[in-house]
């Protein structure tokens, strides 16, 4: 937790997610940034850009700085629900390409991967182990239960398109029409009888694998690495994974807008980001963090932002989400309610 709000007159309400991700941010970023900047923070969980949009619409904004996936952030920005970033206050001059926009500043690079029970299918890279989205869909070659995303369309359609055999560089072109979006959803519909659990959060992804409740699952690489540390028999591949970033947005009309912008500037500095890989295997967005981190070569090579992994992945296209997310989400929710 940040410094108690009683110490300072103002406190920035920072909203992230729970589980190992929120703990990693507290340990690497928030606690020290609050202490060093003198800006108190109130930490809340349950971050959601849908909630941000509702707060902005109702004129009752209570959050100041909200963590979000890049696609949700782009959709909220397109809806006019976010403040423009003041780049005089938030220095992104050393950030990796495509890890910030005018409304969202990247905090970490992560990957949406598919993971599996290694007792059932073998260690990653071993003969016969799954290695592609086509394998995730192939219930004859890899019989067993699946788990897929339930409450959001971010990262849900692209795997289905790649499972159809569309090359990664053509995925967003395929999804640029309603027909393409519907075909992707039909592909997920095909798998639905084998999906025994739909997950709702990163904490749930980790728990499902710790409990060996499902055999194969989509989710975020860092959650699976932390589950493995906790004893889960889990492995994954970066092949065809979606390279994405989480970022911070400031809701339009945030009660402590200026202070939130200052805190965002502080937390984006390399000295905080350099600590993140020790707590979760997500890569810093600030290039300087890689120069000053004391992380081992082995740990750095496990990050989605490492050059040896980047080429295997599909970079998430933020513009596609800004234009198509609303329709894609509506159609995906229809599928889930069938």
Annotate each language-model stretch with its function.
Residues 251-312:
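Mature extracytoplasmic/periplasmic domains
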Residues 73-75, 216-233:
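A ligand-binding cleft/hinge motif common to bilobed small-molecule-binding domains
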Residues 10-76, 206:
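Early extracytoplasmic/lumenal segment of secretory-pathway proteins
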Residues 19-24, 62-63, 67-204:
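Extracytoplasmic ligand-binding site segments that recognize negatively charged/polar headgroups
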Residues 63-67, 198, 215-220, 235:
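Paired acidic/hydrophobic, glycine-rich loop segments that form the ligand-binding mouth/hinge
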Residues 308-338:
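Conserved C-terminal helix/tail region of periplasmic/extracytoplasmic solute-binding proteins
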Residues 95, 110, 182-191, 228-254:
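Periplasmic-binding protein-like
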């Amino acid at each position: 937790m940040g410094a108690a709000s009683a110490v300072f007159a103002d406190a920035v309400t920072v909203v992230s997610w729970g589980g190992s991700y929120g703990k990693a941010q507290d340990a690497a970023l928030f606690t020290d940034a609050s202490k060093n900047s003198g800006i108190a923070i109130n930490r809340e969980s349950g971050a959601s850009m849908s909630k941000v949009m509702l707060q902005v619409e109702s004129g009752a904004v209570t959050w100041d700085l909200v963590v979000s996936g890049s696609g949700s952030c782009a959709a909220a920005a397109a809806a006019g629900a976010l403040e423009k970033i003041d780049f005089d206050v938030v220095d992104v001059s050393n950030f990796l390409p495509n890890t910030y926009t005018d409304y969202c500043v990247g905090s970490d690079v992560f990957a949406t991967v598919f993971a599996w029970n290694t007792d059932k299918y073998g260690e990653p890279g071993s003969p016969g182990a799954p290695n592609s989205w086509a394998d995730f869909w192939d219930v004859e070659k890899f019989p067993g239960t699946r788990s897929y995303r339930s409450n959001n369309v971010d990262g849900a359609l692209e795997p289905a398109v790649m499972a159809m055999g569309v090359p990664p560089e053509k995925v967003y072109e395929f999804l640029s029409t309603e027909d393409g979006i519907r075909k992707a959803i039909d592909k997920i519909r095909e798998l639905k009888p084998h999906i025994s659990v739909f997950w709702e959060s990163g904490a749930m992804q980790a728990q499902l694998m710790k409990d060996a409740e499902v055999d194969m699952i989509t989710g975020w690489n860092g959650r699976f690495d932390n589950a493995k540390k906790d004893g889960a028999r889990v492995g994954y591949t970066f092949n065809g994974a979606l390279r994405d970033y989480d970022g911070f947005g400031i809701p339009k009309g945030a009660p402590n807008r200026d202070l939130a912008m200052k805190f965002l500037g502080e937390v984006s500095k390399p000295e905080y980001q350099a600590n993140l890989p020790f707590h979760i295997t997500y890569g810093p967005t600030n290039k300087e963090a890689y120069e000053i981190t004391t992380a081992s070569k082995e740990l750095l090579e496990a990050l989605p932002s490492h050059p040896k992994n980047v080429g295997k992945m599909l970079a998430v296209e933020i513009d596609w989400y800004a234009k198509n997310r609303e329709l894609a989400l509506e159609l995906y929710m229809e599928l889930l309610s069938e």
